[in-house]
Structure formats: C-alpha cells, structure tokens
Amino acid sequence: MNIVILGTQWGDEGKGKIVDMLTEDVAAVVRFQGGHNAGHTLIIDGEKTILRLIPSGILREGVLCLIGNGVVLSPPALMEEIEELNAKGIPVTERLRISSACNLLLPYHVALDKAREAELGTKAIGTTGRGIGPAYEDKVARRGIRAMDLLHPDQLLEKIKKATAYHNIQLEHYYHQTPLDYQSIYNQLMEFREKIKPMIGDVSALLGNLRRQNKHIIFEGAQGSLLDIDLGTYPYVTSSNTTAGSAATGSGFGPLYFDRVLGITKAYVTRVGAGPFPTELTNEEGKKMAKRGNEFGSVTGRPRRCGWFDVISMRRTIQINSLTGIVLTKLDVLDEFAKIHLCTAYRCDGEVVNEPPFDQSLLESCEPVYEEMPGWQTSTYGLTDYSEMPKEARNYISRLEELLGVPITIISTGPDRKHTIVRQAVFNQVITAKG
C-alpha cells in the first residue's frame, strides 16, 4: 500500500510524529517537495529529534529514506542533520538515497532570499530566509545545479560560475549586497561531494521496485496545503506544490499507484508569518492556545498565530487532495477551554459564504461564522483508548466528521508516538483502539 501523508493547514500540523508512528510497517518513506525550511519534530520516549530534510522514517531501523526530485537540497544542512543523527547513534547514509534530479540549494539562493525579504520590509512574505524560493526559481529557469552534477566536477564548476554571475547582478546592482565568489561556492560543494555522492541514485526506479514487491511506502509532505504555490493563500505561500499531486511529480511515482491520502490537521489552526487567517485569535484565548500548544516554529523559533478550526478551508483542502482519512493532532491543547468554536462559514462583504472566495484578496476581510460547542475541561493528554475520551471531546470529533465528510482515523493526544488513538488501521497497525 502506498500512502501520501500531508498537512492540510499552513504547516506545523504534526506530520512527523504520524509518519514516524506509521513507519513500523513500511519499507520506505519519501520526501517529495520543500527543503530545510520544514521542521518535523519527533518525540520518542521523551527524546526530541527535529528533521528538516531527512524523512521521518530514519528513526525506524531498516526503513529506506528517499529524497525525491521535487526537493531543493542544501548540502550543508543535510550534512549537519546527518551528523546530529549520528551523534544519537542513528546511522543514516546506508539508508538514505537522494534523487539524481534533486536540485541543490546554494549560497546565492540564501543571499537572494534574505535580500528580498529585507527589501520588502513590512510587506515581507515571511519566508524562513533559507533560499527555498530562489532555488525553485533556478529549477524552473533551467539553470539549477542538480545532485547528478556532483558526479561531473568540471561541468559543475562552469555551471556554478554562470549561475553565480547571473545572481550577482541582482545582489550587487539591485539589492546593493556584496557579490558572491563562485570558486568559494564550488569549493564548499566539493567538500560535501564525497559524502553525498554514494547516496545519489534513481529514486523513481527504487520506488518502482518496491511497488512491484508490494511493499508499503509513505510519501511525506512538508509544510501544508494552504501554503501550496498554486492553490494556497497566494502570495503568502511557499515555493513548492504541497498538495497530493506533488507526491507523484516530486518522486517519479505514478499517480494511479497511490492507495490513500491522509491529511494531518490540528484540532485548531496555526500560521507562521504574514497572510490571511480568518479565524485568528488575537485575544487571551489565542495566547492561551499558543502557550498550551507550545506554538513556536521548530526551524525558525518564530511564534505561530493561533485560531479556531476552519471548516471552510479544510473542505477545500479535502477536495484538492482527495483525502481518504484525517489525522487530528494536538487535541489535548483544547482541554482547558470552556467553549470550543468551529468556523462553519465566512461573512464576506456582508454575505455569508460556504466556500473560500476565489479572489484571494477578499479573504483578508472575511469574518468567521462560528458554531459553538461545550468544551470538556478535563485532560485528554496521552489517551490511547477512544472510549476513555470525554463525551464532549467525542462530540467535537463527531461534529468535525459530519461537517467534513471524511473519517478521522487517528487522534494524537500528545507529542510521543505512543500518545495516539488509532480508530482505523492504516497498514497492519499493532496499536488499536476502541471506538
């Protein structure tokens, strides 16, 4: 069985934990888009691990981890992550494979990203400043440096020389930044070359072989669907396609071979950086939500904006991803709220609507229409049995399923992989739950 697991909001939904939990039964986990701007936090027996590029399956012995062609790969970030895992006694290089078609993220991408955000000032998009957007620009413009170029040092030098000269024009003459030295960039890449070279291969072929052997494969998304470059809240989006279609194009795996698409969603909503957020809470409730959820970015440390669950945006996410199941995370964050609110419609220009406005600029002025439900005001932290869930919490989950039309198959009640209620088996899960 081949399953896509992705975020349904603006990222930070808890995908890493769910992927890690499900990898007990899989042969491989694939990253298919994004770069080291994504942080997947895993907590196992109290020990925290943050992964940015390497798939979450790396913490399971014997699971093959693949980085697909849709990822933009920073060599120094990758090596730093490998070293961090090795220091914890986790071997990486034997189980990690990188698509030869994967584009590399280089110093001029980072320099451009930071210069552009500084130029925009108060109108900045709110990128992580890690060069993701400029790296994807080079890919589309066909001047990108790919992993396979590391196999041909002479050609690599010429490509870097040309790309650096091109970007230096912007850096020096438009942004008034110090130009970069192509030789230094090349020398740095050559330092990483010998370590990365053995991991470069044909990821599409590997996936094809696993499929023919009827092995289970997870395709692990980064960020969230509302940050998709085409379908998200543009221009406040990331630079890759974060939706289910990207699992095929970003890995070289045929779309008809996917069996399920699981969408990860928090029991509330968060967002980092600028952009419309209809259910955002800027009051004490929002602060309480952020504090209880420890809502700070795992990569940037930036505080996340918090708000009530948005049924309207979630329905759109279900449609564009063809979700077959929903994983509800961080339910325990709502334990102390006397009242729970669900946004079931928007009020835009005085009119109540049940779909996001096609004109994204109108979303900024849309107000949420709420349905109120009683809270449970008792701890759900660490529960593993659905029958032990407070009645009000079960009612909340049932109402979500009714409004969304998709079953909630897994509920996360805490950060550890064991803090989980599995209502419907994904593969052959050993963990089971009543309800």
Swiss-Prot record:
InterPro entries: Adenylosuccin_syn_GTP-bd, Adenylosuccin_syn_Lys_AS, Adenylosuccinate_synth_dom1, Adenylosuccinate_synth_dom2, Adenylosuccinate_synth_dom3, Adenylosuccinate_synthetase, P-loop_NTPase. SUPFAM superfamilies: P-loop containing nucleoside triphosphate hydrolases. Pathway: Purine metabolism; AMP biosynthesis via de novo pathway; AMP from IMP: step 1/2. Its cofactor is Mg(2+). GO terms for cellular component: cytoplasm. The keyword Cytoplasm applies. Substrate binds at S298, V299, T300, G301, R302, P303, R304. Its EC number is 6.3.4.4. It is found in: Cytoplasm. Keywords: Cytoplasm, GTP-binding, Ligase, Magnesium, Metal-binding, Nucleotide-binding, Purine biosynthesis. This is Adenylosuccinate synthetase. It comes from Coxiella burnetii (strain CbuG_Q212) (Coxiella burnetii (strain Q212)). The gene is purA.
